[in-house]
A protein has these predicted regions:
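Class I S-adenosyl-L-methionine
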Residues: 1-104, 111-112, 204, 220, ...
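A contiguous loop/helix-start segment that scaffolds small-molecule binding in enzyme catalytic cores
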Residues: 2-8, 73-76, 85, 89-94, ...
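Short, well-ordered beta-strand core segments
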Residues: 32-33, 120, 156
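Short gly/pro/ser/thr-enriched loop/turn and capping motifs at secondary-structure boundaries
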Residues: 40-42, 108-112, 129-131, 165, ...
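Short, hinge-like loop/turn segments at secondary-structure boundaries
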Residues: 51-53, 119-124, 175, 199-202
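A short acidic, often aromatic-flanked loop/helix-cap motif at beta-alpha or helix-coil junctions
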Residues: 58-64, 109-110, 138-140, 190-192
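Short, structured loop/turn "capping" segments at alpha-beta junctions
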Residues: 103, 121-128, 178-182
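Short, glycine-/small-residue-rich phosphate/pyrophosphate-handling segment
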Residues: 114-141
């Protein structure tokens, strides 16, 4: 029996145009795939004729058994939201199938968010640090709180939100002023894409009762929402920064 590969394909935010050529090639080779429901529409042209299921309707052992049974017949793939490197819940499956796992990198959700908003997360004189984290990851044992990661000069990028918007804002106000910009991006580059911009002072009102994080949802499918907080959302870089870099960094190299 051939040792068929198990692909873990980082699919970016959900737009097929943002997946790598290697990722598309792996999809074409796979006989069966585990994918979020939202990807079934966006990637429908590549999934036609293939067996597709959502992994979020199964426990860990059921997923393992599902994959094992299909690997006997051919290559199998997971379609991963964003990039495997950042807050991916699929790491335990890579560990389980380690020798057969092929991980294919992709575009992270926060990179796609920066492109959508036409902003960089680090801006000279405004934001010197970009911090990527999740309330689910840092509050599990209660020793570290979200407020410890924010603050002036930091762009805070939040994955896997599990807090009502009111609680999130209250926590962030311990680190930022009420005037601090915030963006909530839902389903980036997927059907239902939506961007809500505001400040910590008014973002809850701008949502008008909507729950972008699915806190009260009964669906097994995860919500694809990202939150970005900080001055980099509204500040551009001044042209003199280019000239500074030219004079101090690039021009001296040309003169050598």
């Amino acid at each position: 029996m051939a040792d068929h590969p198990l692909y873990f394909i980082s699919c970016g935010p959900g737009d097929p145009d943002l997946i790598t050529v290697g990722g598309l090639r792996a999809i074409e080779q796979s006989i069966a795939l585990l994918a979020p429901k939202v990807y079934e529409e966006g990637f429908s042209a590549y999934l036609s004729g293939k067996e597709v299921e959502s992994p979020f309707t199964m426990d860990h052992q059921t997923v393992v058994d599902w994959v094992d049974s299909r690997l006997k017949r051919g290559p199998v793939a997971f379609l991963l939201p964003g990039d495997f490197s950042t807050f991916s819940p699929f790491h335990s499956f890579v560990e389980h199938f380690f020798d057969r796992a092929v991980v294919i990198p992709g575009v992270s959700a926060h990179a796609a968010a920066a492109a959508l908003l036409k902003r960089s997360w680090d801006i000279a004189g405004v934001a010197h640090t970009a911090i990527i984290t999740s309330p689910r990851a840092i509050t599990r044992d209660g020793r570290v709180s979200l407020r410890e990661y924010g603050g002036e000069g930091n762009t805070l990028i939040l994955y896997m939100l599990n807090l009502p918007i009111g609680e999130l804002v209250t926590e962030l106000l311990h680190a930022y002023t009420p005037e601090t910009p915030i963006a909530i991006l839902e389903n980036i580059a997927c059907p239902g894409e939506r961007v809500t911009l505001g400040t910590l002072d008014d973002i809850e009102a701008r949502l008008d009762g909507r729950d972008p994080f699915g806190v009260g949802s009964t669906s097994s499918e995860p919500t694809l929402a990202l939150v970005v907080v900080g001055g980099a959302l509204v500040s551009g870089e001044k042209p003199d920064m280019w000239d500074y870099r030219y004079e101090k960094l690039w021009k001296p190299r040309e003169m050598k």
